[in-house]
UniProtKB/Swiss-Prot annotation:
GO annotations of cellular component type: plasma membrane
Protein name, per record: Cytochrome c-type biogenesis protein CcmE
Major subcellular site: membrane
Disulfide bonds listed in the record: none
Localization: Cell inner membrane
Periplasmic side: 29-168
Transmembrane segments: 8-28
Lineage: Bacteria, Pseudomonadati, Pseudomonadota, Alphaproteobacteria, Rhodospirillales
Recorded family membership: Belongs to the CcmE/CycJ family.
Key words of the record: Cell inner membrane, Cell membrane, Cytochrome c-type biogenesis, Heme, Iron, Membrane, Metal-binding, Signal-anchor, Transmembrane, Transmembrane helix
Binding-site positions, heme: H122, Y126
Record region (Disordered): 149-168
Record's bilayer topology term: Single-pass type II membrane protein
GO molecular function, one term: heme binding
């Protein structure tokens, strides 16, 4: 084998190795990427069987604990749309109605989001940027009232869908 052919052979092997490494890296990233969805996003474009993060506010009056003591059902809203969620496990101490929440899981066939992890905001002034952006896209208006913040739909006089965030 001549020197020129050997160089081309080595270059070809190097490119093949680099291509394989790139393909494996992209495949690993694709499996581990979890997209963020608001309730409105889930209604418009359901993710199928893909694992996603659902963010919004826990709707007032929606939290229900089941008899087994571990399963909890609640609704997540961005004031425009609402998605029912079920979670089996211990919820964070800061989890409560009217608070921001991010749940990671999958949409079930019955239209209920099955969460495998639930994250609550960590203090009274923090809201995950994704949740804040989703509320703004949904047209929610934040109103400050002494001791609490209220998110309501911008185009509605109906306060039935109002979500109240109580500050401790």
């Amino acid at each position: 084998m001549t020197r020129k052919k050997r160089r081309l052979y080595m270059l070809g092997l190097a490119l093949l190795g680099l291509g394989t490494a790139t393909a494996l890296t992209l495949s690993a990233f694709e499996e581990n990427i979890v997209f963020f969805y608001s309730p409105s996003d889930l209604v418009v474009q359901p993710p199928g069987d893909r694992s996603v993060r659902l963010g919004g506010l826990v709707e007032d009056g929606s939290v229900q604990k089941q008899a087994d003591g571990l399963t909890i059902t609640f609704r997540v809203t961005d004031t425009a749309n609402t998605v029912p969620v079920t979670y089996k496990g211990i919820v964070p101490d800061l989890f409560r109605e009217g608070q921001g929440v991010v749940a990671e899981g999958r949409m079930g066939g019955d239209g209920v989001f099955v969460a495998r992890e639930v994250l609550a905001r960590h203090d009274e002034n923090y809201m995950p940027p994704e949740v804040h952006d989703a509320l703004q896209r949904a047209g929610a208006v934040k109103t400050e009232v002494p001791g609490r913040s209220i998110y309501t739909p911008a185009d509605s006089d109906d306060k039935v869908h109002a979500t109240t965030t109580l500050k401790p």
